Amino acid sequence: METVHVVAINPYRKGNKGKVFSYNIDTYDKVIESAAVKKMIQQIRGELPIDGVDLNDAQAVKKAQERLKSELPFFCPHYGMFKNNVRRQENAMPESFLFQTIIDVDDKEYVEKAIEKARELNCSSGIWNGSLLHLCYSARKKLHIGIRMPIGMTIEETQKAYCEALGVPYDESCITPERMIFLTDKDSEIYRSKMWCAVLPESEIQARRKAFLDRGLTVDGRGDAKVNSLQFTVNSLSLIHI
């Protein structure tokens, strides 16, 4: 059966930050492959000049680069659909939860080491085996690591555990259901699994939802858990065979 992908995305430059629309992966690809986005990324990184900005005025250049970054198209990695296309936490549709999250590496000096470490974790025998879904340079040439969440673990628990394994600081701003990520150009994409932004097989979705429900959470892992995540994950790894 062909894998279905769904992305909650605002594909427009200067798009309303409160609006996202559900498309398949083709729209995502058209955005990152566009000449316009490539030029914006080059300007943000200082590889191309910005029209009307004095290159000798460092403050003006920085301000213009920040403005351009804020104008980039963006997507939401945690959910494929938002009710009425409104990007708000309460509008994230539980049934569209993608069981994936994005780790931020904000230390430029650690980016290449983080790429190597992410690949190492992906091949390890622990809970991160097979977890790597996406590697991509951010607009500022830092790093976004897309990973599959271990069964039964919430976004917050996944972020904390993976950041510890990776050796980078945990950032609580990365765990909100409505989190948005600015898109970068195709050349910034280092690796993509075919399961990035994919709808999982129904049997796996049901097993993952049950894992959350058994912890006293919602089907998308929200709420106050009654069972420790590590204990539950260890006891539940046999539920899923990918």
Residue locations for each model-derived region?
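Short amphipathic alpha-helix segments
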Residues: 107-129
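Short, well-ordered alpha-helical packing segments
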Residues: 115, 119, 146, 159-163
